[in-house]
Design a protein with these regions (language model features):
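C-terminal-most transmembrane helix of multi-pass membrane proteins
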Residues: 285-286
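Acidic, glycine-rich loop-and-beta core segments that form the ion-binding/anion-interacting portion
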Residues: 253
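Membrane-embedded alpha-helical bundles of polytopic integral membrane proteins
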Residues: 2-8, 12-240
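Transmembrane alpha-helix interface/packing and boundary motifs in multi-pass membrane proteins
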Residues: 241-246, 267
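Interfacial loop-to-transmembrane junctions
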Residues: 259-282
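Juxtamembrane boundary at the C-terminal end of a transmembrane helix
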Residues: 291-299
Length: 299
């Protein structure tokens, strides 16, 4: 998500001459629509590939999430590098890539990998005198924040066999994507009251409510299929809570970007920024959905 507006250069004579013959770009509905179309097209391509992997099965899902986690972790380390943090990037990215693959097996593998990561980083710290504790913290946070958290998508896909498992995992991810889209549309058109202007100036309470409604809509569809032991009240609760945690994930990434002084985590996806920008709500939203479905006896 983009948070920091670009500062405009002063109108020097040379700049005035260079821009004198350039027609002004119309603002308002036209520019909003163009931006929305670009954002939507890129988002649709990303979503189609993602959904295809979820439908094809657990192995394609794990591979896709593994690649996604590696890219997210790389972008995270690139941002923290701007803040002077010198993480062990190879170790961190490797761990981020392996976490979703570990989720293919027993959950004990995830615990074992988490232990191995802590041990490896600890040994690196002991034998690298110039390494600071802040470097260690960032090295640990990168793969846990990305790969470990996103592994919930793989666990969701594997929790229910067959078509129902694909439907559930697609539904959970779709609830966060639709929440993001509804929040963007509502906030762009009628958003007046800012949520956290110092962290994410574009987010509004109106968009926040719109996002919740979008998420609830998808969870109602999941309930209506009757594929799962999901009651109507619990489906509504899941829709609200998952959307809220998705927003919190978005704000956490916005705080990281604001702290290091960047607008986007990368430029991989037009209209969205980097892979981390596109996945920030999934990081906290999917694991929240998994926990709620387990607590509610759905999984």
């Amino acid at each position: 998500m983009s948070d920091r507006p670009k500062a405009s250069a002063p109108k020097t004579p040379a700049r005035k001459a260079a821009t004198a013959g350039t027609p002004a770009v119309k603002s308002g509905t036209g520019s909003w629509l163009a931006g929305f179309i670009t954002r939507a097209a890129a988002g649709i391509v990303y979503a189609v590939v993602f959904i295809l992997c979820l439908v094809l099965g657990i192995v394609p899902t794990a591979i896709f999430v593994s690649v996604m986690s590696g890219l997210c972790c790389y972008e995270f380390f690139r941002m923290t590098r701007l803040d002077g943090k010198m993480a062990n990037e190879r170790m961190g990215i490797a761990a981020a890539v392996l976490f979703p693959l570990s989720a293919l097996g027993d959950s004990m593998l995830l615990n074992a990998q988490l232990f191995a990561l802590m041990l490896a980083v600890g040994i690196w710290y002991v034998w690298s005198p110039r390494t600071r504790i802040s470097d260690v913290a960032v090295t640990l946070m990168g793969p846990i924040y990305t790969g470990f958290m996103l592994s919930a998508i793989v666990l969701l896909r594997d929790a229910v066999p067959g078509f129902a498992g694909a439907l559930l995992s697609v539904g959970v991810c779709a609830s966060l994507w639709v929440s993001d889209s509804f929040a963007y549309i509502v906030g762009s058109r009628i958003g007046k009251h800012k949520m956290v202007p110092k962290i994410s100036p574009k987010k509004s309470w109106e968009g926040f409510v719109g996002g919740i409604l979008g998420s609830v809509l998808i969870w109602l569809i999941l309930w209506a299929t009757h594929f799962f032991k999901l009651s109507l009240p619990y489906a509504l609760l899941c829709g609200v809570v998952v959307s809220i945690l998705g927003v919190i994930g978005d704000l956490i990434e916005s705080r990281i970007k604001r702290g290091v002084g960047v607008k986007d985590s990368g430029n991989l996806i037009p209209g969205h920024g980097g892979m981390l920008d596109r996945s920030d709500s999934l990081i906290f939203g999917c694991i929240t959905a998994q926990l709620m479905l387990m607590i509610g006896g759905v999984l």
